[in-house]
């Protein structure tokens, strides 16, 4: 889960973040 609000998950992370243009639902 991206802590920086990235729309895409980092390596080894689940795709919990929304795609553009909505990135506010990323797990914090």
Swiss-Prot record:
Keywords: Disulfide bond, Neurotoxin, Secreted, Toxin. It is found in: Secreted. It comes from the Eukaryota. Contains 2 disulfide bonds that can be either 'C1-C3, C2-C4' or 'C1-C4, C2-C3', since these disulfide connectivities have been observed for conotoxins with cysteine framework V (for examples, see AC P0DQQ7 and AC P81755). Belongs to the conotoxin T superfamily. It comes from Californiconus californicus. Its main location: secreted. GO terms for cellular component: extracellular region. This is Conotoxin Cl5.3.
């Amino acid at each position: 889960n991206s802590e920086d609000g990235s729309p895409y998950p980092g390596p080894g992370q689940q795709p919990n973040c929304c795609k553009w243009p909505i990135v506010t639902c990323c797990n914090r």
